[in-house]
């Protein structure tokens, strides 16, 4: 199926491989797939999605397959690879997996018993009261660190908890406004009554 371009070269539109039997019976200028050939048959593994061919004037134009067709082809290839590796679906040679499975452990490992009475983690503590007071909330590690830091500061002589935090923290006392010039800027030329701080 070739048409001549104005430059004299032939444009080949057929895909490599055997031609369908219905393609021999069609006219050379007919566009589209043979009736009932590609629409009903499933693509084989590695086969390209057929491009839509339409005739525009004297030229045959092929359109690229849609993105949905490309995505479906990619999904089919991925499923085929997973099936081949035995990770997807039930193969005909696999035994029925609906029964109870037996678990095999690697050498050197023992199975944990699943009884609810046993704890997976045991805490070394003398009493349960100590455990409750020490870990009182979800932020237990932060509380413990805070207690340790405050205890260390009290031992070193810093009494941070005894000084209230509501005092002004200005270490440099403000200057008295006794001078005739404005201390914030030089715009008011000495008239401090008209100057306002913003």
From Swiss-Prot:
This is Protein FAM219B. The modification Phosphoserine is found at residues 14, 91, 125, 127. The keyword Amino-acid biosynthesis does not apply. Residues 134-146 have a biased composition (Polar residues). It comes from the Eukaryota. The keyword Phosphoprotein applies. Belongs to the FAM219 family. Residues 1-58, 83-146 are annotated as: Disordered. Keywords: Phosphoprotein. Pfam families: FAM219A (PF15260). It comes from Homo sapiens. The gene is FAM219B.
């Amino acid at each position: 199926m070739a048409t001549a371009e104005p430059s004299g070269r032939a444009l080949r539109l057929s895909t490599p491989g055997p031609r369908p039997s219905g393609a021999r019976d069609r006219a050379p200028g007919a566009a589209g797939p043979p009736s009932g050939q590609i629409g009903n048959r499933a693509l084989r593994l590695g086969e390209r999605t057929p491009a839509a061919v339409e005739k525009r004037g004297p030229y045959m134009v092929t359109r690229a397959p849609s993105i949905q067709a490309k995505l479906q082809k990619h999904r089919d290839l991925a499923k085929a690879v997973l099936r081949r590796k035995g990770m997807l679906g039930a193969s005909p040679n696999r035994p029925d997996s609906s029964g109870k499975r037996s678990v095999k452990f690697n050498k050197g490992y023992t199975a944990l018993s699943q009884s609810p009475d046993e704890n997976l983690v045991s805490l070394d503590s003398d009493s349960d009261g100590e455990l409750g007071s020490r870990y009182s909330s979800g932020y237990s590690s932060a509380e413990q660190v805070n207690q340790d830091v405050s205890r260390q500061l009290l031992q070193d002589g810093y009494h941070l908890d005894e000084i209230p935090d509501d005092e002004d923290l200005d270490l440099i006392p403000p200057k008295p406004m006794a001078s005739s010039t404005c201390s914030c800027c030089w715009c008011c030329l000495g008239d401090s009554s008209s100057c306002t701080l913003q």
